[in-house]
């Protein structure tokens, strides 16, 4: 067991060891500031939803209250009848970043983890902007860990619902690569340590409902698994 804030102090060992099957994994990062998503960053995904391929990164925000960890339920709000999974590679920022060039963008990255950009698809169509559709509580599962020694440029991204393969893409098919996205964002905003960037989902998104389990696997980053539950059945 380690105790620290990874952004402001070195990790300290407590000397305690716990069996993996006796602990509950939390989200590996809870952003103090923001989660930023990149929409339609795979051409095949843009086409499957009937959208044009963007000419510059299409970005949106998710609040930090949307973040949950491995094994935690995706809680379906009553306002939506069409909820979708979206498997994504997440980038965790290591230090303050402003006006970053693509050439040095990777020096601002702490590491990478898996993400599920859960979306209320019907609300997304109704609202025209995405705050409610992508910002509801539990709409951003992250985990199971942050990998700091990692090459994200040719990585397989897959998702399953109840064991059935739904998505199978690769980061080499990004429209906008990670350095381009970081440079684009920092032209107008400051990224802070612990900020998370969701880099887009490949084709194959679809509906989930209460009782399903969604598994997200990204090469080298383990499996992020979350059950899907009706919000009315969960007492907070």
Residue ranges and their predicted role:
Residues 70-90:
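A structural-propensity feature for long, helix-poor, extended segments
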Residues 53-70, 85, 215-219:
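Structural signature of FAD isoalloxazine-binding scaffolds in flavoprotein oxidoreductases
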Residues 98-112:
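N-terminal accessory regions of nucleic-acid-interacting proteins
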Residues 45, 51-53, 121-234:
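Catalytic-pocket segment enriched in acidic/His residues
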Residues 1-57, 150-152, 158, 164, ...:
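N-terminal non-catalytic cap/leader segment that marks the start of a structured domain
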Residues 30, 37, 84-86, 192, ...:
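Residue-level recognition of short, solvent-exposed, well-ordered loop/turn junctions
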């Amino acid at each position: 067991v380690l105790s620290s804030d990874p952004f402001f102090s070195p990790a300290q060992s407590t000397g305690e060891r716990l069996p993996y099957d006796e602990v509950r994994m939390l989200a590996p990062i809870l952003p103090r500031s923001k989660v930023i998503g990149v929409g339609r960053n795979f051409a095949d995904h843009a086409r499957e939803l009937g959208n044009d391929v963007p000419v510059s990164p299409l970005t949106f925000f998710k609040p930090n209250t949307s973040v949950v960890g491995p094994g935690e339920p995706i809680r379906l709000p009553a306002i939506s009848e069409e909820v979708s999974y979206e498997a994504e590679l997440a980038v965790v920022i290591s230090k303050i970043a402003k006006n970053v060039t693509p050439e040095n963008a990777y020096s601002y990255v702490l590491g990478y983890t898996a993400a599920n950009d859960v979306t209320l698809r019907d609300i997304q169509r109704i609202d025209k902007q995405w705050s409610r559709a992508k910002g509801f509580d539990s709409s951003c599962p992250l985990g199971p860990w942050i990998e700091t020694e990692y090459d994200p440029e040719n990585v397989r991204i897959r998702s399953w619902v109840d064991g059935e393969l739904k998505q199978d893409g690769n980061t080499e098919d990004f429209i906008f690569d990670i350095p381009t996205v970081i440079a684009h964002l920092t032209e107008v905003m400051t990224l802070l340590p612990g900020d998370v960037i969701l880099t887009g989902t490949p084709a194959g998104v679809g509906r989930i409902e209460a009782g399903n389990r969604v598994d997200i696997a990204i090469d080298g980053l383990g499996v992020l698994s979350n059950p899907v539950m009706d919000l009315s059945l969960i007492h907070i």
